[in-house]
Swiss-Prot record:
Domain of life: Eukaryota
Listed InterPro entries: H3K4_H4K5_MeTrfase, SET_dom, SET_dom_sf, Znf_MYND
Compositional bias per record (Pro residues), positions renumbered to this chain: 56-65
Keywords in alphabetical order: Metal-binding, Methyltransferase, S-adenosyl-L-methionine, Transferase, Zinc, Zinc-finger
Keyword Metal-binding: yes
Protein name stated in the entry: SET and MYND domain-containing protein DDB_G0292140
Ranges annotated as biased composition (Low complexity): 12-55, 66-90, 497-514
Residue span, SET domain: 122-406
ZnF endpoints (MYND-type): 167-213
Keyword S-adenosyl-L-methionine: yes
Organism annotation: Dictyostelium discoideum (Social amoeba)
Length: 521
C-alpha cells in the first residue's frame, strides 16, 4: 500500500508515507506529514510561485502534442491548485509535471474488500475454517497492550433511551449540564427520534437520515420496549445505509463493482469523503452481508415471532418510500445485527462503567471469535464511534486472537446458556473445558437462580409474618372482651371449671370400669 488518506476533524487531508516493510504497522491515526511529504496543493503552489518569480527564461522544451495524457495533466493541476488565482499556461504545465512528483493516492477499498491486505496496516491476518468460519491470527510475536486494530462501524444506531443526549452521527454524548439545560442539541424536526450535537453533524447525516426519517415518524414508541425500539432503529439504519449506496451508484451511472470506479475517483472525493457516506470506512453493503446471521439455525416458529412481524411492518413502511424489500431479507439483517453488534458504552459516572449509548456493527471486529479466556480487549476511543483493540497478554505468531462476547466471571453453565441463547453455539474454549472437571457446585450446575433465591426468601418472610400475626392475635384476645362479655379473669375461671369437670368425668368412667369388673367376677 503506497499511502493512507486521513480525514481529521479539521477537514485537512494528510498523506502519510507507507513503509516498504510489510511487518511494520501503520496506524490509522497518523502523525502530520513531514516537510518532504507535503500536500499536493502546497507543492503545486510552490512550483507555480517559483516559475513566475524566476527571471531566467526556462530552457526550450519541445511543444507537447495535444494527446489525451496532456489533457489529463491539465485537469489534475487545475483540480489540485484551487487556491492559486493565476491560470497556468501550457508551458508551465510541462515544467510542473516534470518538477512535481505527485504522491500516489491509495483508493478506498471497494466491494469486496481484500482482507488479505490487513497485514500491511495491522499485525493480523484473516483465515477461514469450514466449521468455525473466519477468524483472526497474529502475523508476528506481539507484546501485551499492543494495539492490533482500530475500526469504525458499517452501521450504528443510538439507543432509544439516549436519543436526546447522544449524537446520531458522531456518537458524542452531551455533557450532563447540557442534558439538564440543553442548549446545543438539535433534534430532528421531522421524526424527533434522533438528535445531533451540532448543525454540521445534522447536515452530514442528512444524506442517510432522509430515508429513515419517514419510517421513524410512523413508529409508535409506546408500543415497543426501549430495547426493541433500539433494535428496530438499527434495522432501519442499516436499510437506509444500503439505500444511500444504491442512490449514489444510480446517480453516478456506474456499477459499484466495476473497475472503472477506481479511475473516476478524484482527489476532491478524498478531500471530503463524508460528503458521500457518513463515517465512511471503505466498507459497503456486500461486506456487511457476508457476516453470519445464523438464520438457518432458527426453526419455523421464527415466522410467528415478533421479529418477523416487525420486518413485515418495516416492509410496508419502506413501500411508501418506493423501496421494495423482502421480509426474509430484513429478517436476515435483524438477526445479523443481533449476532454481530457491539454495545457502545457511555461516559462512566459515579464509579459505574457507563450505560449503553447504542450499538454498531463492526465488520472487522466481527471476525474475532469468542473465548472465555480472551487475549484481546476493545473499547471506544475518546467518546466516539471508533473502537480500539489491544492485547491482554503476549501472543505468538500464528496464535488466534479472541474476544469475549459475555461476562466471563459467570459459572460454566451460565456462560454456555448465554452463548447458546444469543449466539447459538456451545463454547469449548480452554477455560470451559477446564471448568468441566470442577465439582458441580463450582460450575454453577447446583446453584440456584437468583429468582429462585428471591422466591425462597419471600416465602420465609411470609412464614415469619404469619407467626407474628398468630402471636399478635393471641395477645389481642387476652386484652379484649369476649363476645359473651367475659373478661380474662372470667375466662381463666371457666378454664379451671372445665378442667374440674373433665377430672370428674374421668373419675366416673374409672368407677364404672371397676363396677363392670366386679360384675364379671
Amino acid at each position: 500500500m503506497d499511502g493512507v488518506i486521513e480525514s481529521p476533524s479539521n477537514n485537512t487531508i494528510k498523506i502519510s508515507p507507507s513503509t516498504s516493510d510489510s511487518s511494520t504497522t501503520t496506524p490509522i491515526i497518523t502523525t502530520p506529514p513531514t516537510q518532504s511529504t507535503a500536500t499536493v496543493t502546497t507543492k503545486a503552489a510552490a512550483t507555480t510561485t517559483t516559475t513566475e518569480a524566476s527571471t531566467t527564461p526556462p530552457p526550450p522544451q519541445p511543444t507537447p502534442t495535444p494527446t489525451q495524457s496532456t489533457a489529463t495533466v491539465t485537469k489534475e493541476v487545475e483540480t489540485t491548485t484551487e487556491t492559486i488565482p493565476p491560470i497556468v499556461t501550457k508551458g508551465k504545465i510541462k515544467k510542473s509535471k516534470k518538477s512535481i512528483k505527485k504522491p500516489t493516492i491509495v483508493k478506498r477499498p471497494t466491494t469486496p474488500i481484500d482482507y488479505k491486505q490487513w497485514h500491511t496496516e495491522w499485525p493480523i491476518h484473516v483465515y477461514s475454517h469450514p466449521i468455525n468460519g473466519r477468524y483472526l491470527v497474529a502475523t508476528k510475536d506481539l507484546d501485551e497492550q499492543t494495539v492490533i486494530l482500530r475500526d469504525l462501524p458499517y452501521t450504528w444506531a443510538v439507543d432509544h433511551a439516549t436519543c436526546d443526549s447522544v449524537c446520531q452521527h458522531c456518537f458524542l454524548e452531551v455533557p450532563l449540564n447540557q442534558q439538564i439545560l440543553p442548549t446545543d442539541f438539535y433534534m430532528c424536526e421531522g421524526c424527533q427520534r434522533v438528535g445531533y450535537c451540532s448543525a454540521n453533524c445534522r447536515c452530514i447525516d442528512y444524506s442517510q437520515h432522509r430515508f429513515e426519517c419517514q419510517i421513524f415518524k410512523e413508529l409508535d414508541t409506546e408500543e415497543y420496549s426501549p430495547f426493541l425500539m433500539s433494535e428496530i432503529k438499527l434495522l432501519v439504519r442499516t436499510l437506509s445505509r444500503k439505500w444511500l449506496e444504491d442512490s449514489i451508484t444510480q446517480t453516478a451511472g456506474i456499477d459499484i463493482n466495476d473497475e472503472t470506479i477506481k479511475k473516476q475517483n478524484t482527489y476532491n472525493q478524498y478531500k471530503n469523503p463524508q460528503s458521500l457516506i457518513p463515517q465512511d470506512n471503505g466498507l459497503r453493503y456486500n461486506d456487511y452481508a457476508e457476516l453470519v446471521s445464523n438464520v438457518e439455525n432458527y426453526n419455523e416458529s421464527l415466522k410467528e415471532s415478533l421479529s418477523y412481524w416487525i420486518c413485515k411492518y418495516v416492509v410496508k413502511l419502506s413501500a411508501k418510500l418506493g423501496k421494495i424489500e423482502d421480509e426474509f431479507d430484513l429478517l436476515n439483517i435483524l438477526l445479523r445485527n443481533r449476532c454481530n453488534a457491539f454495545y457502545i458504552q457511555g461516559r462512566p459516572r459515579d464509579g459505574s462503567s457507563g450505560e449503553s449509548r447504542g450499538c454498531g456493527v463492526y465488520v472487522r471486529n466481527s471476525f474475532f471469535n469468542h473465548s472465555c479466556d480472551p487475549n484481546v480487549n476493545y473499547w471506544v476511543v475518546n467518546n466516539t464511534l471508533e473502537v480500539e483493540c489491544t492485547l491482554l497478554k503476549n501472543v505468538k505468531e500464528g496464535d488466534e486472537l479472541t474476544i469475549s462476547y459475555i461476562d466471563t466471571t459467570s459459572p460454566l453453565n451460565k456462560r454456555r446458556e448465554k452463548l447458546l441463547e444469543g449466539y447459538l453455539f456451545n463454547c469449548l474454549c480452554t477455560k470451559c473445558v477446564a471448568d468441566e472437571s470442577l465439582p458441580l457446585d463450582q460450575t454453577g450446575t447446583l446453584e440456584k437462580d437468583d429468582d429462585d433465591n428471591d422466591d425462597e426468601k419471600e416465602k420465609m418472610d411470609e412464614d415469619d409474618d404469619e407467626k407474628d400475626d398468630d402471636i399478635n392475635n393471641k395477645n389481642d384476645k387476652k386484652s379484649k372482651y369476649k363476645s359473651d362479655g367475659s373478661t380474662d379473669d372470667e375466662e381463666d375461671e371457666d378454664n379451671n371449671n372445665n378442667k374440674n369437670n373433665n377430672k370428674n368425668k374421668n373419675n366416673n368412667s374409672n368407677n364404672q370400669d371397676h363396677q363392670n369388673n366386679d360384675k364379671s367376677n
